[in-house]
Regions:
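Short S/T/G/P-rich N-terminal loop/turn motif that feeds into the first structured element of a domain
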Residues: 3-99, 107-127
Length: 127
């Protein structure tokens, strides 16, 4: 018998660090991930340590995309209280030891597809 997998959503939220309620600014990195287990573990370590940085953000979220235009499989979002904090993060995160460790562990398991910045104008039921 042929089984077809159905999803109630187009996205599964896999790993979250921090509390992004009320943080209306975000940066999202969309990727094609070839080895989710390695990528997930490296992301979990990096996101837990990134809060130590002054520009570390309020929350980190890793999603798996069930549908997504071509080669998109996962996305990571980092949330902030202001657009200035988001821009500070973008200017500095690549120079941190946390990001260097992430790239060393997961560097061959993902390819960047696109990155974008977002602003929530109104949150409905943020919890």
């Amino acid at each position: 018998m042929y089984k077809r997998q159905y999803y109630h959503n187009l996205t599964s939220y896999l790993i979250a660090e921090g509390d992004g309620r009320g943080a209306n600014y975000g940066v999202t990195f969309v990727s094609e991930v070839s080895n989710p287990v390695v990528y997930f573990n490296a992301f979990k370590k990096m996101s837990a340590k990134m809060f130590k940085e002054s520009f570390g953000g309020e929350a980190y979220l890793l999603r798996q995309q069930h549908t997504g235009g071509g080669n998109v499989t996962h996305s990571v979002s980092v949330y902030f209280n202001s657009n200035a904090e988001a821009l500070d993060f973008l200017a500095n995160y690549m120079n941190t030891p946390q990001f260097a460790e992430f790239v060393q562990e997961a560097g061959t398991t993902f390819k960047s597809v696109r990155t974008y910045m977002e602003q929530a104008l109104l949150q409905y039921n943020p919890d």
